[in-house]
Regions:
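C-lobe/activation-segment region of protein kinase-like
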Residues: 248-259, 263
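ATP-binding pocket architecture of kinase catalytic cores
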Residues: 33-194, 201-211, 226-229
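Activation of the activation-loop gatekeeper triad in protein kinase-fold domains
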Residues: 235-240
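ATP/Mg2+ or Mg2+-diphosphate-binding catalytic cores
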Residues: 2-8, 183, 266-277, 281-293, ...
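Juxta-kinase regulatory segment immediately upstream of eukaryotic protein kinase catalytic domains
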Residues: 2-27
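Catalytic-loop of the protein kinase fold
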Residues: 211-213, 218
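All-alpha amphipathic helical-bundle segments outside canonical DNA-binding/catalytic cores
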Residues: 164-165, 292-304
């Protein structure tokens, strides 16, 4: 058993977990080694080793709302659906919906051998991507290739017809998120009205429903060690659904710096974007890999900025003394202003 301190979350009942694993034929009879990896208010992740089995367990903490159990099942259905596809993903091993085992629904997925951009110290890429800018470019191309491959998965054949409501997806976006914003509203957000009106008046050129991640970015993928850059897995499917996969592309590029040659403009949030491909090159790569046009990317970028601003505003409105959530305040204002500005300046006519 991995040593933990009093503040580190622990598995509710290891004996019951072992008994369940025995019943599932997962490392039967061997001792279980387990350790906490990471977590938050919605999910905890533990590393498990038992015999030849090496996996990760994803489970809501005891304090998470009851609906997270259904969310865990949704995540499980998506990673299970990716089995046999060319989308880099974690192996789907087993799911448990019986609260008698650990009190919450959980699933086991293959342990990913690689690294996460979220684990980088001070936003510095691991070797060789810290100094080899040509190799670093591959990280960006692999990032968008992941969602290009995801967009081509036959979600109906994979049994995901009831996962989302793809019909009318774009028609619902503005109404749904405007209503959400009205419920949490604590201040005016300049740019909101302009972006909302523009989104109501425009649509994508060709909406083709598919599996979408919902929060696609460097923070939610893992790469294999060493060069060349190779995507190991897309992770954290909390927002996954069947909708418009091209919104994932908008999520990636709406903050992509125009200039990646270096300096302040090349810092894309938590990672150093110096030496990365240009926004146009990233879009071209997605288009080539997915077979989709990207002429309507302004629509997706306005929607991404507008929607992300509303999501983060909820965190800011309930921040209290939490410095991380307080920090969302100015970020939200910048995002919504940028959404309004892009809506007013874009020449997209769709």
């Amino acid at each position: 058993v991995t040593a933990t301190d009093e503040t580190t979350p622990t598995i509710a009942d290891v004996d019951r977990l072992v008994a369940w694993m025995d019943a599932e034929g997962l490392g039967t009879g061997a001792p279980l080694e387990h350790g906490y990896i990471s977590g938050g208010s919605q999910n905890e992740i533990y590393e498990l080793r038992r015999g030849d089995l090496h996996c990760a367990m994803r489970i809501p903490p005891p304090t998470a709302p009851a609906e997270r159990d259904a969310g865990i099942v949704r995540e499980w259905r998506i990673i299970e659906a990716l089995t046999g596809t060319d989308v880099p993903h974690t192996e789907a091993i087993a799911v448990c919906t019986d609260p008698a085992v650990l009190g919450r629904t959980f699933y086991l997925m293959g342990f990913v051998d690689g690294w996460s951009p979220m684990g980088m110290e001070r936003g510095i890429w691991p070797a060789p991507f810290d100094t080899d800018l040509e190799a670093r470019q591959g990280l960006a191309y692999q990032l968008v290739e992941g969602i290009a491959l995801l967009s081509k998965v036959d979600w109906k054949a994979k049994g995901l017809e009831d996962l989302g409501r793809p019909d009318g997806f774009h028609e619902r976006q503005v109404d749904r998120w405007t209503a959400f914003f009205e419920r949490i509203k604590g201040r005016e957000l300049p740019g909101f009205d302009e972006a909302s009106a523009w989104l109501r008046a425009h649509k994508p050129l060709d909406y083709i429903p598919g599996i979408m991640h919902g929060d696609y970015q460097f923070a939610n993928v893992m790469f294999k060690d060493g060069a060349p850059a190779r995507l190991a897995a897309i992770v954290d499917w909390e927002m996954g659904t069947v909708g418009d996969p091209k919104l994932d592309l908008g999520w990636v590029v709406h903050t992509w710096p125009e200039d990646t040659s270096g300096g302040e403009g090349s810092v894309g949030g938590y990672v150093d974007m110096t030496g990365m491909p240009s926004r146009a090159e990233v879009l071209e790569h997605y288009s080539k890999q997915s077979g989709r046009q990207v002429d309507d990317i302004d629509y997706y970028c306005v929607l991404a900025k507008w929607k992300l601003a509303i999501v983060l505003e909820q965190g800011y409105q309930r921040a209290g003394a939490d410095p991380k959530l307080q920090g969302f305040g100015p970020v939200v204002l910048d995002l919504m202003a940028a959404a309004g500005e892009l809506a007013e300046s874009s020449d997209y006519k769709g």
